[in-house]
Amino acid sequence: MNSSHVLPNFSSDYQEGAHARVLDALVATNMEQSSGYGTDEHCERARDLIRQACQAPDADVYFLVGGTQTNATVIDAILLPWQGVIAPNTGHINMHEAGIVERGGHKILDTPAVEGKINAADVERICSAWEGDGARDHMIAPALVYISQPTEYGTLYSLEELEELSAVCRERDLKLFVDGARLAYALASPANDVTLADLARLTDVFYIGGTKCGSLFGEAVVIPERGSIRQFVTQMKQHGALLAKGRLLGVQFEALFEDGLYLTIGEPAVKATARIREALKRAGYVVTMDSPTNLTFVALDQAGHERLSDKVRYSIWETLPDGRYLARIGTSWATPEEDVVAFERALVR
């Protein structure tokens, strides 16, 4: 790789700091004296703004410090010791969270995903298998379904798919949890037909990602039915997810939800990724799936990897069975136009 200059970096979507409006809000409130642990007026106003955006006036809203803590806290708060969580085998909790769910004493009931997604039939199959097993008293019972929007591959659940998952969860008395670490990029995609209000209507809990979507750090957990998860703040504390200076989270989400910034902040990334994806196809590269958000996955042989990595940076997601690399190319709300142009030029041989 060429090290003589800084290469355009598409390795991930959380390399930059925060949106200017978020930073301005933090600076403007820096010397305020506020109560701690999310009880301040900024957190309360941010909660109200989120409730309005989700059309969920009675929702509980909590601010946590990061995605792993959020997933661990929510899953542990919902599940009893003999219960497990159904998840895609490619899901974040199953692949890249260092066994935090298992460390909390809960089994992940993973099932093969297609382009990062599972469906209602998968959930029904797992529930039916457990229910029909004569040894089920010796087995973990499915009680929660975990998905993400977008998925780890940048693909999207359609409204119809989410409605079907929600229906089977209600029929089977399961909870439905949507990881929204990159939710801003889903909301900004022209291919998306799932709104915040839909998430509030169809899920038992979801979270609105900040760390990857314009804040310095932080995620906002939305529980549409008030009081349905008891002692959640206590459980946040137990998982190291409760910030003493909680107003730092409230101020950031206040800025993100004023004037609908969160709903549009992902648009530049989605447009940039669409350009990169089309440029890759024109250059003859194999784009493995048409993910309509801010992530692109492309299969590279050794020569292609060496040629491209000399001009731009990206991450290697995995090695494919045929020996090629699956590269992940990510954009963010802050990706410079000149970096996108540089990527397009890097593909011209």
What are the language-model segments listed below?
Residues 77-95, 124:
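Conserved PLP-anchoring active-site segment centered on the Schiff-base-forming lysine
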Residues 105-143, 147-152, 157-164:
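PLP-dependent aminotransferase-class I/II
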Residues 19-67, 89-90, 94, 100:
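Conserved N-terminal alpha-helix of the aminotransferase class I/II PLP-enzyme fold
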Residues 80-82, 274-348:
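Conserved C-terminal alpha-helix-loop-beta "cap" of PLP-dependent enzymes
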Residues 9-12, 61-65, 87-88, 147, ...:
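General beta-strand structural signal in soluble alpha/beta enzymes
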Residues 115, 141-142, 146-148, 156, ...:
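Active-site C-terminal subdomain of aminotransferase-like
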Residues 157-189:
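Catalytic PLP-binding core of fold-type I/II PLP enzymes
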